[in-house]
Amino acid sequence: IRRRNFIPPDKFPYNNQIIYQDFAPLIYDSGNYEPALDKAVELIGYHQFIQEEQPRLRAAGKHVGIGIVTYVEGTGIGPYEGARVTIETSGRVSVATGVGTQGQGHYTSFAQIVAEQLGVSVENVRLTTGDTAEFYWGAGTFASRGAVVAGNAIHAAAVKVREKVLKKAGEELEVAIEDLELVDGLARVKGSPETAIKLGDLAARANPMRGAVKPGTEPGLEATDYFGPERGATASGVHAMIVEVDPETMLVEIKKYVVVHDCGVVINPMILEGQIQGGVAQGIGNAFYEQLHFDENGQLLNASFMDYLVPTADTVPTILTDHVETPSPLNPLGIKGAGEAGAIPVGPLFAQAVEDAFDSVQLEILEIPLSPNRLFALLQPGLAAVA
């Protein structure tokens, strides 16, 4: 049923007829949902599980279930972000942007965007984030918008600096701009690598100490630019999970977990992998462990990690991941956000897989967290009915 009701790729952009959190109509910019589902079905071994493994395990008295959940994530909302990119006389590149960073990998992924435009190594790009002394315009890091909005602002500024570099290098080397390339911190002539000039030297020469600056130009190799998306980009994906539930303790063990994600063009696969895995871990906490308890006076009873349960290394499974890339038409980099992709579908996925594990019982799970005592209580009416 889900496969039959997917929005076809040729129907995008697709108006969802509701208002999104940025107070604009929710319009899905792009997507290709069926390949993601196909990959998830293959990675989880869906057909083999339901045809062979699940019947065998159930015959042995095991309560095993499988779940598959698809989702769409709204990302990359406005209003805007900005950035400044500067090539210093040392040849290093400094970048400043208003967004903050809390471990998303900005220092690597944003540096990659600049390095690709200017032909320098990532190690030679110095990034400053969230410092109003360096760059004071910006909205912030939230709602899976950092890479989409700030990343494209950085890209726009880097493109402007690239244009300045090529223009200045063409003047210094007396060649046409189209005959130049930026490689290894050099502006050099294509096919004649010995005819080159360092970017640091160009930066020094772009700041004349004598004479007038040429009309239509400005000193230095620096640019500031901003990016404000027309609307948010929509990422998507599929999570699949196989679980086993102990009927005595009601503990849920995750036997296999699969994520297939589409966030458009991927900047850094390793960082994306970490984002997804961290989100899944948080989602597992939401689905099975984390809950605040209060007494009749409103006093919080589990205010420390001694008694507030969170997932640990031995309860978070190995997560198999794969990707589908459907570029967003809303920004030059073609990217979509990934900050919440790991967490969004985990609760419904838990509910679906656990319901399947008790298929002989009329079990309907409508809320999380699904702690053992809550699962026990939910099962009692159904168990009594089949007793």
Locate each region found by the language model:
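Cofactor-binding beta-sheet edge motifs in enzyme active sites
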Residues: 2-35, 42, 47-387
